[in-house]
Amino acid sequence: MMTENREQSPSYKRVLLKVSGEALMGDGPSGVDPVMVDMVAADIADVVASGVEVCLVVGGGNIFRGLAAAAKGMDRAQGDYAGMLATVINALMLQNALERRGMETRVMTAIQMAAIAEPYIRRRAVRHMEKGRVVIFAAGTGNPFFTTDTAAALRANEMECDALFKGTQVDGVYSADPRRNPDAERYDQLTYLEVLARDLNVMDAAAISLARENKLPIVVFNMHAPGSFGAVMRGEGLFTKIIEAD
């Protein structure tokens, strides 16, 4: 039975939001839904207005997936670089939506693209957030064979974030894909080791291990519900929290 999480609202000062490319598709099969992008921007703006420093890592699976292309014969590294470019497209869309709402925003890329974004420099990114700017990290880690989930765990640790929030198409972590298996079990809380041992397909093993090594909490929630980011920040609604064992 699904139960709504009711926990004492934690006090977050700085967080990283991982927005999957699929979360930006809306109900479409691919591409970017401008309505969905605007809704995500509105949620982020509300959280920033509450005094929380926010940075983002965006995926690119709504546009291109290097792993899928490699399965069809494309060189894996080339496919991953193409996927990095897809994340930059999503980042620019989110930047535009945030700036239309009056939010100062900076896009920083792991691969230099000086005409459209700043190069990723850790200290500069921290300074941007201290000034109240939203920082969007794009192009993953800048290296092939690493997912944007791993990039999210890496950047969250580099930015010394209090937690990593992953916005997806479902309201937490399940034992199987609930869109395909109606009997899938939903979890309110898991440990890093449980995620790895059960091979739960929420983030790749490298990302989970990186979070575990640095005791970085991960919160997985449904990005498609308006106001969901702010709600889970307050400990409300449905989500799954991944933490170290007691």
Curated annotation (Swiss-Prot):
Record gene name: pyrH
Protein name: Uridylate kinase
Family assignment from sequence similarity: Belongs to the UMP kinase family.
Keywords, comma-separated and alphabetical: ATP-binding, Cytoplasm, Kinase, Nucleotide-binding, Pyrimidine biosynthesis, Transferase
Entry superkingdom: Bacteria
Binding site for ATP: 18-21, 61, 65, 168-169, 174, 177
Source organism of this protein record: Gluconobacter oxydans (strain 621H)
Localization: Cytoplasm
UniProt pathway: Pyrimidine metabolism; CTP biosynthesis via de novo pathway; UDP from UMP (UMPK route): step 1/1
Predominant localisation class: cytoplasm
